[in-house]
């Protein structure tokens, strides 16, 4: 899974956050993918982010969902930063 993966250090900080974290992260060791998406119905002063954790197939694509969770924007940013620091990689591919 080297195509479509970027090893970029992208950090989100509470004080300077413009947009919530969105997109896919991949952990090659565990074979897991996580998708961050904004919760469309959250109020602008109380933004929420969904995370959807997937098992990946041999091509590094989402195969089966493991769980979904709704987070505050602070929790989502903290989770994103911890995953990036832990070696998860940003996925640039668009999955269908």
Predicted regions and their residues:
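Terminus-proximal functional modules
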Residues: 1-96
């Amino acid at each position: 899974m080297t195509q479509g993966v970027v090893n970029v250090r992208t950090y989100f900080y509470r004080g300077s956050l413009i947009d919530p974290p969105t997109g896919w992260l991949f952990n090659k060791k565990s074979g897991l993918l996580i998708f961050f998406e904004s919760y469309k119905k959250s109020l602008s002063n109380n933004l929420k982010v969904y995370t959807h954790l997937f098992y990946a197939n041999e091509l590094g694509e989402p195969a089966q969902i493991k769980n979904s969770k709704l987070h505050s924007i602070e929790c989502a940013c903290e989770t994103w930063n911890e995953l990036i620091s832990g070696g998860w990689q940003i996925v640039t591919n668009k999955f269908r």
